[in-house]
Amino acid sequence: MRWTRRLRLCAVGAVVASAVFSPSAARAAEPSANRLTGLVNPFIGTQNDGNTFPGAAVPFGMVQFSPDTGHNTGYDYTQKRIRGFSLVHLSGVGCAIGGDLPVLPTTGDVTETDDAKYAATFSHAHEQASPGYYRVGLDSGIRAELTATQRTAVQRYTFPATRKANVLLNAGQSLHKNVSSKVEILDDRTVRTEITGSGFCGPSRPYTVYTVTRFRRPFTAHGTWYQNSITRGATRSSGPGRNGAYVTFDTTKDRTVEATTGLSYVDAQGAAVNLRAAHVSSFDQPREAARRAWEERLGHVRVRGGNAILRTTFYSSLYRSFLAPNIGSDADGRYTGWDQRIHRATDFTYYQNWSLWDTYRTQCQLLSLLAPREARDMAISVLKIDEEGGWLPKWGYGTIETNVMSGDPVTPFLTHAYQQGLLKGYEERAYRALKKNADGVPPADTMYVGREANREYIANGFAPYIKDRPFSKPGDSDYHHGGSVTLEYALSDGMLAQMAGSLGHVADAARYAARSRNYRTILDPSTGFFRARDASGAFVGPADPARSEGFHEGTAWQYQWLVPQDLRGMVALIGGERAANNRLDSFFAYDRLLKDPARTAREVWVNGPYAYYNADKYNPQNEPDLTAPYTYLSTGQPWKTTDVVHAALTLYTDGPTGVTGNDDLGTMSAWNVLSSIGIFPVQPGYPTWGLTTPVFDRVDLVLDRAYYPRGGLTITAPGTSHTRRYIQGVRVQGTAYEHTYVTTDTLRRLGSLEFTVGARPSGWGTAPEAAPPALVAEQSAGK
């Protein structure tokens, strides 16, 4: 997502891995026997704009305590200076956000106030990370260690023997724009800050975070700064610009300094509440608790088979899938709603940070499978945004809407939650919010864009592409992406039609089903491809679908498969299965792929930095194509899905460049996890899971019995490998199964899903009735 996406380097993964994990490189913590956390490498994705972070967090925690090296999203593996360890990071986003309160240990006199000037040099040889823990030896001789609880950042610094061991707390510099800040030294152990920031991929409304930092022992000196002016002994500084504080310790006898920082999006009281609730008695206590939390979370999936690199990339992806959304409510249940008022969550945990254009396609499905209780609270939190703030979100950060990206991603996010049974007791409330969103446009005086082009879409059947239309609000504009927005709106309408019908809203269901076929309105009969239309209805932009305009971060070639609500109808529209398969083969460079899958993935699919446009090939690094490999399940050639998926999986490696593009809050990581275990959500917003060959001999899923009564699912594919990857047959609970998909209802009844694999394609799944059903089949049949 966004302009900073980088493409993977074309080096062979094994060579990259060998270089990265040489003794001179940063490393994941040494694996311990039977510990899944030892298989996670947090440095994966920290180079080439995967934009992940290597620091400390617990699953879905409010705090992500991690080093910032000067990269716009925090940490870049190629940079060698740390500006500070800050509290907030979003894994894999494409624009600067967070980075609040960078802290840094130093020695000597405090003479600089700009983190770019006082940044500490370091070497990857002295850097180590594992889930919930980060350590680095700075060239200054200071060792910094970080860990985290749900709402606190815990730090331990080991200094040389000196009377001038400092900790700098920089309230006035963040990754995003810092609007104003305040720092207060309350006593000889405590520092409090208030930080207001704004901006994510452009301007946004401001938001405020509050922190309280408590040191385990008193400091011997202190001071504050404003801009370039340092005032020794001062206890307060505030206003726009750089504000910060430093505290000094004598480490001639005790070289260790420990501190815990409570974070809140509510107020200073909330930060103090969160600090007390963490009950941190020593650094090692929360470090071990974080490790146990991750061990338990990762233990929901256990795999057998595969080599060491495959297991590392898999569990590292699983780890990143659990980093967001993030807890937004304090330990006392209070949270700041999108009306900027304080509310209290009494029977759920409030979550925030919604990269919905990305996560609705993979990550929310993975969480509904492996973390349904948290996923339920996340869905309820999204409903609270509507109830308190007035509209459903598009891309929410903290307490604000950023309006980043386009379309209507919240609808498939919530309809999926409904179909998974996560909204029991909230069904009609969710439907009312979704109906309002689907049929309207947010008022002009609100911060929401919503379905901005909805009036034209409902009236004419398509969202117009108006290239130079002025922005009505901060963020992206749906009018600037009319082609892809039409497809996204239609997808959402199809998913909402299923929910409406299930709830008995028959007329609404028919209306949304009819609208879900609006993808047809932008099919240019002269080219046979989708093409944006202007306000008058004329097709606009180059006729060449590889050079199309009006498609967000993609081309008409890449968006043509984004019709999960009626893929059969789409296939018929372009000439039937044979024509569709010819297009798919060209799209994936299938003949070349068979000869050299990894090279095709890196040299044909991946074309260079910012390669969103001017392409007629599959882009495995961006969201519009995430379901595209699974299209073959609906065209009678399911074995080709396995060929493409397994080739795409070679792009995930165990080094810093090992994430395919921005990870986007776990979206690309979740794609890896789901594709690796052989079940993938092919109709985002509806509980349909496509089947493909797992890369492991056996996968054991531990499932929540409240949602999956059997409490687990075992997926087997004995002998699966690069050469034996084709499905010969599937058995469900021991019974032969010919469909290329299963539903969530089927998964709830399953204890086992068995794949038999071989060296050549078979006839499995090739019958027309084996394909996933079109969700609007009856309505589309007569059109």
Name these PLM-found stretches.
Residues 1-29:
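Secretory targeting and sorting signals
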Residues 30-412, 418-487, 495-521, 527, ...:
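Accessory carbohydrate-recognition regions in carbohydrate-active enzymes
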Residues 492:
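ATP-dependent phospho-/nucleotidyl transfer catalytic cores
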Residues 533:
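Active-site and channel-lining beta-strand-loop segments
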Residues 713-721:
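Short aromatic-glycine motifs in intrinsically disordered, low-complexity regions
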